[in-house]
Amino acid sequence: MDVEHHKSGHISRPTVDIPPRKLLSSAKSPSSVSSPLRDYKEQKDYCYDSDSEDPYAGDHFRMYEFKIRRCTRSRSHDWTDCPFSHPGEKARRRDPRRFHYTGEVCPEFSRHGDCSRGDECGFAHGVFECWLHPSRYRTEACKDGKHCKRKVCFFAHSPRQLRVLPPSPENHISGGCGGSPSSSPASVLSNKNNRCCLFCSHSPTSTLLNLSRSPSSSPPLSPADKADAFSRLSRRRTAVLNELISSLDSLSLTEALAASSSSPVTMPISTATMIASSNLSSNHHHHRLPPWLDVGDRDLQLQQSSPLRFALSPSSTPSYLHGQLQPPPSSFFGDEFTPRGGRLSDFSVAAAAAAQARDKNSFEVGSSGDLDLGWVNDLLT
């Protein structure tokens, strides 16, 4: 440092000499040059957070720009340290805003390392497309927490970094205009099934009543509706019973015999009854049983004591009916044989003839074995 003395006696300020070499080196020092790529390289030793000031560590960049935007650098550099995509790089991703695919791994790509459908595939190709997809990125917590040393971590390291997806699949993912997973083929199919199940579950008779995803505004079957349903059933049962009783009241003896003759269980006894009644009505002037009907004492006593035993057993046939059954006359089902046609006296005559026949045979059956046709008259009057 040189000190100059003026003629007046005053001392001037000291002059400091600095070599030009140091000025040039300080101006061109790497610490004075600031660039995003340099900051990215300096911060590669620790995991990036959304809380940091690095623009390459934000959620939006990671989901929609990382390994998607083309790198513009002309010099050769390490692709693993660059956040942009390069030609032929395996970590290259498809833009989820342009290509609609889900966060599920493509089975064909995982087996063979390539997919025949290419960019049109509806599934993720590779780890970066799978875990950086808007439907999966930072939706789970990192097992290492704040001590994570990964360059690019797909998981959250704090509660503030944890991304909570909207509950409705039809809403778009925050940060992208077309990054909704609901537009993929698989999700569209699942949404259609969900809507179908939702519509079907609103039906009162549906088995999917308890499988509805969204609760309905009102219960599917209120107590008032249950009471109405039971009242409708009660009214229906009463109407059926009334109809059955009226049909039984209007049923004549001939119609009952005709209906019972078609059943294999009651065929023998009903056919014998029809034949006997037809012959008795045609010969009521003679007041005698037909000569071809041979009724023994024992068989008649068994028939009068238990008339339902033969009707309820399909294998048991009275002895007097073996080989003696004949088809009823063609006019048996005519109007002249219906009790409503005015031939009620035929039944009285037949009853009187049967009583006289029992008297002629001179056997005692007892009070319980007498033929009582009074209930027939009660039904017909």
Swiss-Prot record:
Residues 21-37 have a biased composition (Low complexity). The keyword Repeat applies. The keyword Metal-binding applies. This is Zinc finger CCCH domain-containing protein 61. Interacts with MARD1/FLZ9 and RD21A via its CCCH zing finger domains. One of its GO terms (cellular component) is P-body. A zinc finger (C3H1-type) spans 101-128, 137-159. Keywords: Cytoplasm, DNA-binding, Metal-binding, Repeat, Zinc, Zinc-finger. The gene is TZF5. It comes from Arabidopsis thaliana. Its main location: cytoplasm.
